[in-house]
Amino acid sequence: MVKKMKNIRNFSIIAHIDHGKSTLSDRLIQKCGGLSEREMSDQVLDSMDLEKERGITIKAQSVMIDYKDKNGNVFHLNFIDTPGHVNFSYEVSRSLAACEGALLVVDSSQGVEAQTLANCATALEMKLSIVPVLNKIDLPNSNPEKVAREIKEIIGISALDAIRCSAKTGQGIEELIEQIIKKIPAPDGDEKKPLQALIIDSWFDNYLGVVSLIRIKNGIISKKDKIKVMSTGKTYFVDHLGIFTPKKINKNYLKCGEVGWIVCGIKNISAAPVGDTLTNAKNPAMNMLTGFKKIKPQIYAGLFPVTSDQYEIFRDALGKLSLNDSSLFYEPINSTALGFGFRCGFLGLLHMEIVQARLEREYSLNLISTAPNVIYQIEFNNGEKIYLDTPSNFPVDNKIRKIKEPIVECNILLPPKFLGPVMKLCIKKRGTEINMIYHEQQVSLKYHIPMNEVVLNFFDELKSVSSGYASLEYDFKYFKTVKMVRIDILINSERVDALTVISYYKNAQNRAREIVNKMKELIPRHQFDINIQATINNSIVARSTIKQLRKNVLAKCYGGDISRKKKLLKKQKDGKKRMKKIGNVNMPKTAFLDILNIHKD
């Protein structure tokens, strides 16, 4: 059946975590007969166990369903499910780039949240048509009128005629589909023009190699076509292509306006970069499509296997994981304390947790992560500039002219009664207030806060002081000159690189003392004294000693000459000295976790 362009609708779903996005997707699939009752399962599009368990969407997913309206016209709806969490905004931007419209789903019992606001701003920037949807109207505390006013006030979109629906019960789903057809424009494009296809996502399949999700902007792509990746110039033959309904359906061709998948025998995900353009090798397009900005890692942390014999499994696991996650960066490192491991770059703390959880669950690894760090910009007296993400490489000499740290703009939405504690928290985190706006039921706060403070445990503390009601969205803004110092931890005068941290100079002494005290609790006693020291610019600022274990060498000397006892004690003392010179401090690797999580205590 030949599809008419005017009968195609491409749209994404924008929503905060837990506002019912994945459930709404399930209802749309069910309503349009994408899956039978027997095949339906909760959160069809959330394929990872981790997605279902945490109740969040991590990867973008695409589905094409057919809907017959009251007049008998068949419409083809392509919708791309997007993640709602702040760490996965890169997935959202690339999903929106493939659409003409977006559903703005808001929980009618909770109202607008910060992440909804951020994703909606991205959609408006891309000039997409926004269809507001008030979900969960079946709940007793639902207040759609109030939430509709909130959407108008906070986001600036009229929502008085927004569809009221319940994804759980299916109420209002038919009206929603009619609104999608009415309000979201059909894609524009010309199938006679040279092929231009935007790569929305790529993932690795063990049997097929790299599978890419693409949106055809112009032209047609068919099986056996020779295609070219425009950024690299490399050519491949199309082996398979098709659509998801959400079952994988093979097809002979895809034409402009459609969203589908393609397999070209590519073995490495970097050969089909997300945001790139595919064109026909024989009749190439002149220009690449404007994709979306490539997101760089925001935080870095070291990951190490607890037992060294797992290193090779860990290396292979990271390689496989990075095939499905183009934003994950990693490089091998060697730590004197933790052995061989990898320095990994992540988009945020949740991204880091998800990656670590997947490595541990899917590959049965036992891992230790060092404290997350941000990138600092360092300018030397000779004008040279470098970017550093590893604390142990941080220079401590006098050649530094200035150190700059990344600042993020935090947008916080919260009920007015929690305003005081939240503002106190932002000030404690070295934040600068930019503005504050009172809405009918919520207050919108905008602060500039150092990223270093945000990535540690700002989100947890924010939820704590606001009883879980505040929502946060943050975005990198600029680098700001600041006085930072490096805290080194020494055990028996040996530096432990894994415990080196960068800290704001006013907090540095307290942080150093906390680490030293925690280490004293966690390191087991040895046959010799263990000296723990914290230094800032080579000056000791905190110190503690773990006293040696001593055997009572006088136990067998019931009486007798004092010189005999002195001789035994001297022999023990000499032995301890010798042991201290050659003895290694056995520090349990699990103790590192407690020390590195010190900021969460």
Curated annotation (Swiss-Prot):
Its EC number is 3.6.5.n1. GO terms for cellular component: plasma membrane. It comes from the Bacteria. Keywords: Cell membrane, GTP-binding, Hydrolase, Membrane, Nucleotide-binding, Protein biosynthesis. It is found in: Cell membrane. It is an enzyme of class 3 (hydrolase). GO terms for molecular function: GTP binding; GTPase activity; guanosine tetraphosphate binding; ribosome binding; translation elongation factor activity. It is a peripheral membrane protein. NCBIfam families: lepA (TIGR01393), small_GTP (TIGR00231). Belongs to the TRAFAC class translation factor GTPase superfamily. Classic translation factor GTPase family. LepA subfamily. PANTHER family: TRANSLATION FACTOR GUF1 HOMOLOG, CHLOROPLASTIC, TRANSLATION FACTOR GUF1-RELATED. HAMAP family: LepA. This is Elongation factor 4. It comes from Buchnera aphidicola subsp. Schizaphis graminum (strain Sg). The gene is lepA.
